[in-house]
Curated annotation (Swiss-Prot):
It holds the Pfam family Pribosyltran. GO terms for cellular component: cytoplasm. It is found in: Cytoplasm. It comes from the Bacteria. This is Adenine phosphoribosyltransferase.
Length: 181
């Protein structure tokens, strides 16, 4: 990806200081999603490394991962798997607890969402501490998925999420980095 492309994408992301609490800068991708050219560019850049790899499924994390993952799945002619908060899926599920800043939560997928050995890419808008993404990788592996890679529009490298995923042997790809929180 060129420096110009990185600049276009980073500029399309709104930064909101002191949200949701003082000292945090919230990186809001709704401005990128609302800009047709920037949204197209982001999806094109997200799928580029995976073209021709025979990816079976894109797994998107609730909620913005659904938007990006659905677009990626369409472009790669792959299926889409929603990873949801516990209690939101209607069929039999498997679940995984994951760490939050203060406590834990649970996510789940349908038991038949991925066949053993299928190649899956995990997708979300942002990687921070990696707690949710690590939980999602473990959940996908629990039902036999081969997690090929994880991709995100935004990386907050100071929070260590990329390193947490790489420690699990997962390749991580991102489009824009923002320092700090």
């Amino acid at each position: 990806m060129t420096a110009s492309t990185k600049d276009i994408l980073a500029t399309a992301i709104r930064s909101i200081p002191d949200y949701p609490k003082p000292g945090i800068i919230f990186r809001d991708i709704t401005t990128l999603l609302g800009d047709a050219a920037a949204f197209r560019l982001a999806v094109d850049e997200l799928v580029k490394p995976y073209e021709g790899l025979g990816v079976d499924k894109i797994a998107g994390m609730e909620a913005r991962g659904f938007i990006l993952g659905g677009a990626m799945a369409h472009q790669l002619s792959a299926g889409f798997v929603p990873i949801r908060k516990k209690g939101k899926l209607p069929y039999r599920t498997v679940s995984m607890a994951y760490a939050l800043e203060y406590g834990t939560d649970e996510m789940e997928i349908h038991v038949d969402a991925v066949k053993p050995g299928e190649k899956v890419i995990l997708c979300d808008d942002l990687i921070a501490t990696g707690g949710t993404a690590v939980g999602a990788v473990k959940l996908l592996r629990q039902i036999g998925a081969e997690v090929v890679s994880a991709c995100f529009v935004i990386d907050l490298p100071d929070l260590g999420g990329r390193k947490a995923l790489e420690a699990l042997g997962v390749e991580v790809r991102t489009l824009a980095e923002f320092s700090g929180h």
